[in-house]
Amino acid sequence: ISGDVYNSDHHSLAAQMAFARELYRAAQAGVQIFIIHGNHDPDEAWRADVPLPPSVYVFSSDKVESVPLLVGGETAAMVYGISYKNRHMRENLALRFRKKDEDTFSIGMLHTELGVAGSPYAPCTVDDLRNTKMDYWALGHVHARKTPSMRPYMVYPGNTQGLDRSESGEKGCYLVDVGAYGTVTLKFIVTDAIRWMDMEVDISSFQNPEELVREVVKQRATLREKTGKPNIVRLILRGQGVLQKAVSTPEGQTYILQLLNDKEKFHHIRKARNKWFHHGKKPDSNIINDLLSVLEQFDIKADILI
């Protein structure tokens, strides 16, 4: 886990218990866990009121440490890592890493804003990481999934659950398979329970609000089928035409929302703001209720839940 176990330096007891519970579940399955602190959960703010299982190793913020990854009681790889001491880390921590000659396979863990010079989040370059001779880099900090390098692999898996509408699309983690000769294969595993999505509709060809509503309902059904899970959707209306004026006024938006509500048996559209349509009835699922409650506390408009 390459930093930011928690999304802030406030680690509630409930969050700690939930995290520890999953770590114990992993331990029962024989899974080792390696953790470094990031900017949201730096070493100086880390709280561990709930004990973690012995199979969990949390890396120090004082120096780069190396810990064996055991498979069947034998060392399969060495894991290198260093934590953030405080929220801002302007040092290029990559320069502290160096693979040992005797390592069969080496994994580097770093919380970094790669390629952004002057960043307060351990800035470094691809060449800095490559020069360490590590065989794989497990990177944290960036919430989007991306792979800056494939030789060696430098991987940002992104986060496992989108937190707001800026984090749209599939979220999850990577299962990394290392072959007998050090070949690396990545498989993305989807883990998000709720997905943030954007839906764009061009209104140019519509002659009346009913045509717009039919198109939105059609696209919404397609999106449900595609993702197979609840979605929080930002509806973006683009283009010009007969409906442009109507959808730009509060009265017109209210009318469109009423038409959409009439088409939905289990969803209620709550409000509209400018070009954003918001869908707000809380479904029965506890996790969705919890998510919408959090969004409302922070006045984040939840758009369309489908």
What are these regions (language model features)?
Residues 1-7, 38, 235:
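Active-site beta-strand/loop signature of hydrolases that rely on acidic residues for catalysis
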Residues 4-8, 113-115, 240-242:
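A short, flexible beta-alpha/helix-coil linker loop
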Residues 7, 39, 86, 92, ...:
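Detector for Asparagine
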